[in-house]
Amino acid sequence: MPGNRPHYGRWPQHDFTSLKKLRPQSVTSRIQPGSDVIVCAEMDEQWGYVGAKSRQRWLFYAYDSLRKTVVAHVFGERTMATLGRLMSLLSPFDVVIWMTDGWPLYESRLKGKLHVISKRYTQRIERHNLNLRQHLARLGRKSLSFSKSVELHDKVIGHYLNIKHYQ
């Protein structure tokens, strides 16, 4: 049978067309903006890379600690612009308390809102970061599995978040 023959020194060609067709959403559909209230939203960023560790790619996301689900996520550099994109996705939601770590841009962006800066109140999202690292090898710090393109990096991680949190 032609499908069972060994490759004899040639690696099989991977077809990434199915991954490139993915169109993951960036906001959950489980929580209805305007009708549901998010009491405690934890925000954090997670480091990843594409091709080489010098080409950093950051995942910013918000986590509803009571529903134990990701509310929204964006990819980009670790800048105010990326944080602003995440905040614009979260603007339709009624969030009572924001909980973040001590990154200074959170404090400047959440000025005027009820904002708690504490490692104690970001334990759930930090645990979720660890779960993402365990489930997705491309997010591991020391791994042979890494993303070769920004497009596939964003789509694969976005698709994982869609399956686990948004549907």
UniProtKB/Swiss-Prot annotation:
Signal peptide location: none
GO biological process, one term: DNA transposition
Coiled coil: none
Keyword tags: DNA recombination, Plasmid, Transposable element, Transposition
GO molecular function: DNA binding; transposase activity
Pfam family, one: DDE_Tnp_IS1
Keyword Chloroplast: no
InterPro entries xref list: Transposase_27, Transposase_27_IS1
Keyword DNA damage: no
Function comment: Absolutely required for transposition of IS1.
Entry's family note: Belongs to the transposase 27 family.
Protein name from the UniProt record: Insertion element IS1 protein InsB
Record organism: Escherichia coli
